[in-house]
Amino acid sequence: MKRKFTKTVLNAVFVLGLCSIMGGTSYAWDGKKDGTGTHALIAEHGLTMLNNDLNQNEPKPIKQNIEILNKYLKDLKLGSTFPDYDPNAYDLFQDHFFDPDTGNNFTLDNKWYVASPIYDTAETQVRKFATLAENEWKKGNYKEATFLLGQGMHYLGDLNTPYHAANVTAVDSPGHVKYETFVENRKENYALNTAGNDTTQGIYKDAVANKDFDQWMTQNSVKYAKKAKALYYSHSTMKHNWDDWDYSGREAIKNSQVCTAGFLYRFINEVSEDQISGNNLTNEFNVVLKTADNEYAGTDDNVYFGFETKDGSKYEWNLDNAGNDFEKNQTDNYILKVKNDVKVNTNDITKYWVRKENRTPISDDWELSNIKLISNGKVILQKDINKVFSGNQVYDINK
């Protein structure tokens, strides 16, 4: 959102300068707009592994949902490359990075980065897209669900990339692009078709051990990102030789495929069971808002999201990411953390609201299409709004 003009201009100049250095891309595993490249290979072979490893005694709903996923393989692959071409993406793809030891992307960990920090990471994006995918799947929107799931698999692939797990960008080292180009040219040599065991063992058994989907996703991402980060320091820097890079690439792509196969198995289990998460306490939410695709739908005014609990406590957040928020036809995502790590019971929420506040005496109207709120790996609020906000206005959403 264009709030603080001087700060925004400085951020823009800084980011444009970095784009010229980094080539305007995070690079990571390669992916083409048409659903080909390394990311697509990882997604496809992850599903192939699951099909080949599927125990024949799996429940009927598991088998049926895997068949649906097979039917929409093309959408899975398209989703797996889309984040690199999303017109609403961060200019430096900051959310494609995740250091498992700090929990941050490079905007918080690398001292040379002086623009506004980005709090989305590859880990948070995996959880967001998988949750949105599960929500659409359970409504029968399989094509959209699979495309969203593919986007989650993109970020899962990114955190398996050694340079991304170590928060080493093209600014930090020319090896970033060189290494990933090296791997792209050899990706077919690293392809797998099985995890080496069926779905009653190994990665598949591990994938369903923790019944809390949201917790498991974080644990899974941290586990594999640690492997990727270790590979960076042991075999992937500019100090290492071609044999080291070949070993690193083989291990990293193997981990990406194995990780994907396990994740797809867990996802299929989630959508095959009528279960409700028992964890209703949280200090973090993820709100996703879609601005309408109409002329003048966007706004530069301040936008807030909040809710009230049955004890009268009110919580509200100013929705402001780096760059421009609430542009025409743009989907904006915000990680909302409750102050002082206070845990909120989502069952106690009685109402939600969206509030627009003028920044100048003249209102900059805004048309909101829809909103979704994520908590603990579940969509707990989804509503089509389709409303124009004028002036200082509050829109209440009853639970």
Curated annotation (Swiss-Prot):
Domain observations: The protein is composed of 2 domains; the N-terminal domain contains the phospholipase C active site (PLC), in a cleft which is also occupied by the 3 zinc ions. The C-terminal domain is a putative phospholipid-recognition domain, which shows structural homology with phospholipid-binding C2-like domains from a range of eukaryotic proteins. The ability to bind membrane phospholipids in a Ca(2+) dependent manner and toxicity is conferred by this C-terminal domain, which also contributes to the sphingomyelinase activity.
Keyword vocabulary terms for this entry: Calcium, Cytolysis, Hemolysis, Hydrolase, Metal-binding, Secreted, Signal, Toxin, Virulence, Zinc
Subcellular location: Secreted
Annotated GO MF terms: phosphatidylcholine phospholipase C activity; toxin activity; zinc ion binding
Taxonomic lineage from the root: Bacteria, Bacillati, Bacillota, Clostridia, Peptostreptococcales
Organism: Paraclostridium sordellii (Clostridium sordellii)
Entries under CDD domains matching the protein: Zn_dep_PLPC
Primary localization class, coarse: secreted
GO biological process: killing of cells of another organism
A GO cellular component annotation in the UniProt record: extracellular region
EC number: 3.1.4.3
Domain Zn-dependent PLC: 29-278
Signal sequence, renumbered to the chain: 1-28
Protein residues bound to Ca(2+) 2: 320-321, 323, 325
Cofactor(s) needed for function: Ca(2+); Zn(2+)
Binding site for Zn(2+) 3: 84, 96, 154, 158
Protein name (Swiss-Prot/TrEMBL): Phospholipase C
SUPFAM superfamilies registered for this protein in UniProt: Lipase/lipooxygenase domain (PLAT/LH2 domain), Phospholipase C/P1 nuclease
